[in-house]
Design a protein with these regions (language model features):
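Residue(s) in the substrate-gating loop at a strand-loop-helix junction
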Residues: 143
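Active-site loop immediately N-terminal to the catalytic Tyr-X3-Lys motif
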Residues: 97, 101, 148-154, 176-177
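Canonical Rossmann dinucleotide-binding motif of NAD(H)/NADP(H)-dependent dehydrogenases/reductases
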Residues: 4-35
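The beta1-alpha1 cofactor-binding region of Rossmann-like NAD(H)/NADP(H)-dependent oxidoreductases
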Residues: 42-43, 61-73, 105
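Alpha-helical segment proximal to the catalytic Tyr-Lys
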Residues: 128, 172-176
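Substrate-binding pocket helix/loop in short-chain dehydrogenase/reductase
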Residues: 98-100, 107-109, 194
Length: 199
């Protein structure tokens, strides 16, 4: 396994208590980073702390669909850790497994709000914190569904396509600064979102 040197780096991982988020958190801790998990499920966040068992890992309960909360929690991290180097936008939901014609509008909006709008909110809020130190790395977790468009998963596919477009736009906007913005598009993996899709 390739080793990365993240000593003295401060990272935030949204949805970091389980699934991809927890795997990312564990790898960052192994690489020397200080990590703050953002999750809405305190029970899972506490389990993650017990599993990882590192003094470099903490958590905050954060609703990433609330822009004011995001700004407030970023300020808390900056105050406690001195800076924010890395931000991983990982939190998300699968949404309903149904056709476009039968997709309830309210449920569609929930998926778009958490999977796309929340990523925009977090990116918008964290960039000024990174710009202060002329350094930043933002990674947005999308999905192969955002490229291919999965049947019976229109809201999820659309939200992840939006994340890909947002990542490209923001990356170009910050190209002259020392803030890199990238996107990862995983295929299916056995996570809570996978379970939601196959219920």
């Amino acid at each position: 396994m390739i080793k990365f040197d993240l000593n003295n780096r401060v990272a935030i991982v949204t949805g970091g208590a389980q699934g991809f988020g927890l795997a990312i958190t564990e790898r960052f801790i192994e690489s020397g980073a200080k990590v703050v998990i953002w999750d809405i499920d305190e029970g899972e966040a506490k389990k993650a702390l017990e599993k990882v068992n590192s003094e470099n890992l903490t958590y905050q309960i954060v609703d990433v669909s609330n822009y004011e909360t995001i700004n407030s929690k970023l300020s808390e991290v900056e105050k406690s850790h001195g800076k924010i180097d890395i931000f991983i936008n990982n939190a998300g939901v699968a949404g309903m497994n149904t056709t476009v014609a039968e997709y309830p509008i309210e449920e569609w909006n929930k998926v778009i709000n958490l999977n796309l709008n929340a990523v925009f909110y977090c990116c918008k809020a964290v960039v000024p914190f990174m710009a202060k130190n002329d350094y930043g790395r933002i990674v947005n977790i999308a999905s192969i569904a955002g490229k291919e468009g999965n049947p019976n998963a229109s809201a999820y596919s659309t939200s992840k396509a939006g994340v890909i477009g947002l990542t490209k736009s923001l990356g170009k906007e910050l190209a002259q600064k020392n803030i890199a913005v990238n996107c990862v598009t995983p295929a299916a993996a056995k996570t809570r979102i996978f379970d939601q899709m196959t219920e």
